[in-house]
A protein has these predicted regions:
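Conserved CoA-thioester-binding segment of acyl-CoA-metabolizing enzymes
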Residues: 1-53, 57, 91
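Terminal low-complexity tails and localization/encapsulation signals of metabolic enzymes
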Residues: 2, 248-262
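Glycine- (often His-adjacent) and acidic-residue-rich active-site loop
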Residues: 54-92
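CoA-thioester-processing core
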Residues: 89, 93, 103, 109-163, ...
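Well-ordered beta-strand positions
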Residues: 121, 161, 165-167, 173, ...
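C-terminal long alpha-helix characteristic of the crotonase
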Residues: 124-129, 180-228, 235-236, 241, ...
């Protein structure tokens, strides 16, 4: 049986690729393996950025394998436990303090959008992408935090339109409403995502971790709480070797050499 996720390492970038082409369903084995990898990556200092993609160029993911729902309940003990696994994995991606870059191409539906919504960067294909939370079509609702994250990402207006109409949108439309950061030709998409991840690893890891905490936590905090959190990040950051090196390099008009201490 093939691995549900292909893992590659390029310097400080870990590349995870869903391995169930052409549909790249998010099977039970996929979610169990993703759970393992997420917590492993969080504790691996040598990984400073992650790319989440999929094999082939047909589809990122059509989402959960619905035929495995009953098996999943049996495996996890209850429907609630099965749901909590998904919610906890996506939340761990979101809060681990390392940037994740997701590639969206072909079908990106249900869980195939909800997992990328937990990532910090989303890049889409210019053509052929169909992105959405179409659970209404089968009498369901987004179950992995998708409705909340989509609303935070694109606003109530667009979230209502997409979810209540089970609407699938293109890459350029996703860019227009703020769901993705960039669009690229499908043949370039994965390379661009990996290049972006390498770019992020050149930044000071401690500063990235602090800012991701401020930004992600800011979705749930008041402005006053967020400002206090930012203040704490500033105090923590200014005592780091990377902060001192960055300031010294600026004054000396040279490129900084960060040691990536977090």
């Amino acid at each position: 049986m093939s691995e549900p996720i292909i893992v590659r390492q390029e310097a400080a970038v870990t590349i995870l690729s869903i391995n169930d082409a052409p549909y790249n369903r998010m099977s039970l084995d996929f979610m169990d393996r993703l759970e393992e990898l997420v917590y492993e990556i969080a504790e691996t200092a040598s990984t400073r950025a992650v790319v989440l993609t999929a094999e082939g160029e047909d589809n990122f993911s059509v989402g959960m394998n619905l035929k495995q729902f009953a098996e999943g309940i049996e495996r996890k003990g209850s429907a609630d436990a099965l749901l909590d696994q998904r919610l906890n994995v996506i939340r761990a991606i979101e809060t681990m303090g390392k940037p994740w870059v997701a590639t969206l191409f072909g079908y990106c539906l249900g869980g195939g959008l909800e997992v990328p919504l937990g990532c910090h960067f989303r890049l889409a294909a210019i053509t052929d992408a169909q992105i959405g939370l179409p659970e209404m079509d089968i009498g369901g609702v987004p179950a992995w935090g998708g409705s909340a994250r989509l609303t935070k990402c694109v606003g109530e207006h667009h979230a209502i339109d997409m979810i209540l109409r089970a609407k699938k949108i293109s890459g350029p439309e996703a860019l227009r409403i703020g769901l993705v950061h960039e669009v690229h030709p499908i043949e370039e998409l994965k390379a661009v995502a990996i290049r972006l991840a390498h770019e992020l690893t050149a930044m000071p890891a401690g500063s990235i971790r602090s800012m991701l905490q401020v930004i992600v936590d800011g979705r749930e905090k008041s402005l006053a709480e967020l400002i206090q959190l930012e203040r704490e990040a500033v105090i923590e950051n200014r005592g780091t070797a990377d902060s001192r090196e960055g300031m010294l390099a600026f004054l000396e008009k040279r490129k900084p050499t960060f040691n990536q201490q977090s």
